[in-house]
Curated annotation (Swiss-Prot):
Protein name: Cytosolic neutral trehalase
UniProt family annotation: Belongs to the glycosyl hydrolase 37 family.
Residues that, per the record, bind substrate: 280, 287-288, 324, 333-335, 400, 449, 452
Origin species: Botryotinia fuckeliana (strain B05.10)
GO BP terms: ascospore formation; trehalose catabolic process
């Protein structure tokens, strides 16, 4: 039988405020006032009379109110937000960057008054981690309009793995989620990269979505102060059309759903949500979205991954491809293709829901169209090898870059033609000046951007000629996934409707698994012939112009394992010969130091080269290793990557960034390469992290075992953990 005391305690705990609730909940007036009342009502000068009847087998509750023992629920602090925040920053943020890190030289100790003593008794908050968490919590409390709060100590000394996981799931994803419709078009339609004299919100609508044109036209009419420019997209997209649109750059419409407006009761449209990478990247991006989906699915946010697949299907139907990003100047450029795997992962989570099979069918049909119209068509397809290349069309200088980005390249040409820099760019873009050398340069520059690996000495000035192991592994995966899906879910025949027909296809034409299995077998033969190097035991890119295999050692060699195109013998060779070349303290390097070559003032670092590591390379390698049953290698690499992210998070005020220097032990988030490091520039508290790094963290925690996760929470380096496990 349950005792009265046990019941009393259970009731008290059940009414307790969750100390790990999201900030907007935890710092709401109702929640924090309730926390204050609970803290005060448990402050007693004596326990006598409260539990006067001793209960057999239970220890009498300890006296409270005369000291600050932690007790069952930990300390709570009574804090005046503004004054404490000011004192904390003045004392501990010695470099005045609105962050508290191991580089600050303050005393690393600040006393706070406990709630149970009404602030009279004080307790020292010590160390970088707790103080930086305090800075973050006070910043959030202030943003939520709080002047005074009750703060649980458990929010300050929370296990860092739990804290980062919690923030990713409950805060970062929300901070990165966007949608495009009338409610946000004023913000979403503006482009920080807009170079025109009259920057204004602008949206292009494809001819196949007249309902969206009517919707946005009404938005523009109802809200003239927004100055929204609603434009029809030209029916035929050519490099010349895209170039001419650069004088009026704009957002591209994405998928919307029909809903009922609660205020009017009438039908209207609402944008399907998507997750952006973060930092200055605020549109729907290509392969970022796939990587993010891996984490979204882990965090039970499959609805976001599903809507991103639907957005991609819309893009393929109306723009012909999954775009680099949804701005008009990206219309000729795609990114690494992951749609089939993304759709199958989502389908696996929603297959019990009505309409799930239609969702999968649409995604596979869209992938078939993309495969034929983009990746196995001119100019990307190489008929000699049967392999594909990143080789987008386009004219002139990429307009989305900073004006000064190409100044060193173009200045001599401007001088040659006796023009200013701006005059020369305009003349070159519009064909009044023809320079074959520049044409070749920008062909490869666009290809590098399409590859997602911008920039790298692996690809510089050659990318458009390369049949890369990464792209062809992805296309092999498309072929196998499409064959599997048609065979497993559609009785081995899939009818192609008119909107997804391409080339000489006719509406109603059937696709069968054997067609796609045959394509996969052919691609594997070509990959083995041109990209596999038996002597070195790894894959390399192939230069289709020079007709020779490249020598740059890239972590994309492991994409063959992710896709399943490597034989068991090739996979074993990769683990034996390639893996040691790329493994570093923080996980996998993008490339080897030897391949990168010397760097200096005239040859600076490139962000996709040594010594940098990126989340996509880690996740694809882990998955590939597990596919071939190299579980220990996958766990080791995942642990190293997670440890690096966690230590930077602990030591540098909760930072989570786009990329890391995986050779740096102390401050791996500090990257000396072009474009800086998105996610590091914040004041007080990070609210987004970075999309695919967020995903890699929660996805990686699924790779390591439970013991590793506990050890990770104690910030134990891999070598120390491994040594202890092998005593």
């Amino acid at each position: 039988m349950t005792s009265p005391l046990r019941k009393h305690r259970t009731s008290s705990v059940s009414s307790e405020i969750d100390p790990f609730a999201a900030a907007h909940v935890y710092y709401s007036n109702d929640t924090n006032q309730k926390s204050f009342r609970q803290a005060r009502t448990r402050t007693y000068s004596s326990n006598q009379g409260i539990f006067s009847t001793p209960i057999s087998g239970l220890e009498k509750p300890k006296r409270r109110g005369s000291h600050d023992d932690i007790g069952d629920h930990g300390r709570k602090f009574l804090i005046q937000v503004d004054s404490t925040l000011e004192a904390l920053r003045k004392q501990e943020d010695t470099d005045d960057n609105h962050q508290i890190t191991i580089e600050d030289v303050g005393p690393k100790s600040l006393p706070l008054g406990t709630a149970t003593s009404n602030g009279f008794r004080r307790y020292d908050i010590r160390g970088t981690y707790m103080l930086s968490n305090l800075l973050q919590e006070l910043t959030l409390a202030k943003e939520n309009g709080r002047e005074q709060i009750i703060l649980d100590e458990s929010r300050l000394n929370e296990n860092p793995v739990n804290r980062l996981s919690r923030l990713i799931q409950g805060s970062f994803w929300d901070g990165l989620t966007r949608r495009i419709d009338g409610s946000v078009i004023e913000i979403a339609g503006r482009d920080p990269k807009d170079w025109t004299d009259d920057p204004r919100p602008r949206i292009y609508i494809p001819r196949g979505a007249p309902e969206q044109h009517a919707y946005y036209t009404k938005v523009a009419t109802d809200r003239p102060e927004v100055r929204l420019d609603v434009c029809w997209l030209p029916e035929k997209i050519t490099p010349e059309v895209v170039r001419d649109m650069n004088s009026k750059p704009g957002l591209l419409a994405v998928a919307m759903e029909e809903v009922i407006d609660p205020s009017t009761g009438e039908k209207t449209l609402k944008g399907l949500p998507f997750v952006v990478p973060g930092g200055r990247f605020n549109e729907l991006y290509g392969w970022d979205s796939y990587m993010e989906s891996l984490g979204l699915i882990v965090n039970d946010k499959v609805h976001l991954a599903k809507s991103m697949v639907q957005n991609f299907c819309f893009c393929i139907e109306h723009y012909g491809k999954i775009l680099n990003a949804t701005r008009s100047y990206y219309l000729c450029r795609s990114q690494p293709p992951f749609l089939t795997d993304m759709a199958l992962r989502v389908f696996d989570k929603i297959k019990h829901e009505p309409g799930s099979l239609d969702f999968l069918k649409t995604a596979i049909l869209a992938a078939i169209k993309e495969y034929h119209s983009v990746w196995t068509a001119e100019p990307r397809y190489d008929p000699v090898t049967g392999l594909s290349r990143y080789r987008p069309e386009g004219l002139g200088v990429p307009p989305e870059t900073e004006a000064s980005h190409f100044e060193h390249l173009l200045a001599p040409y401007a001088e040659k033609y006796n023009m200013t820099f701006k005059e020369f760019v305009d003349a070159y873009n519009n064909g009044r000046v023809v320079e074959k050398e520049l044409d070749d340069y920008f062909l490869h520059d666009r290809a590098v951007r399409e590859s997602g690996h911008d920039t790298s000495y692996r690809l510089e000035r050659v990318c458009a000629d390369l049949a890369t192991i990464d792209l062809n592994s992805l296309l092999y995966k498309y072929e196998k996934d499409i064959a599997y899906t048609i065979r497993t879910f559609f009785q081995d025949k899939l009818e192609v409707p008119a909107e997804f027909c391409v080339g000489d296809m006719t509406p109603g034409q059937l696709q069968t698994s054997s067609m796609w299995d045959r394509r996969a077998r052919g691609r594997k033969l070509a990959i083995d012939k041109y990209l596999w190097n038996k002597e070195k035991g790894m894959y390399f890119d192939y230069n289709t112009l020079k007709k020779e295999q490249c020598t740059y050692e890239s972590a994309t060699t492991f994409w063959a394992m992710w896709a399943g195109v490597a034989s068991p013998q090739q996979a074993a060779s990769l683990v034996t010969n390639a893996l040691p070349k790329f493994e570093a303290a923080g996980g996998l390097l993008s490339g080897t130091e030897e391949s990168r070559g010397a760097v200096g003032l005239d040859r600076p670092n490139r962000q996709w080269d040594y010594p940098y590591g990126w989340a996509p390379q880690q996740m694809l390698a882990w998955t590939g290793l597990l596919r071939y049953n190299y579980q220990e290698d996958a766990e080791r690499l995942a642990y190293k990557w997670l440890f690096m992210i966690t230590t930077a998070f602990v030591d540098f005020n909760g930072v989570v960034v786009e990329k890391y220097d995986v050779t740096r032990v102390v401050d791996p988030h500090k990257v000396d390469a072009e474009y800086g490091n998105q996610g590091s520039d914040f004041k007080g508290v990070a609210k987004e992290g970075f999309g695919w790094v967020n995903a890699s963290y929660v996805y990686g925690l699924q790779i390591i075992n439970a013991h590793m996760r506990r050890t990770l929470g104690t910030l134990t380096p891999w070598d120390q953990y491994n040594k202890a496990m092998n005593l």
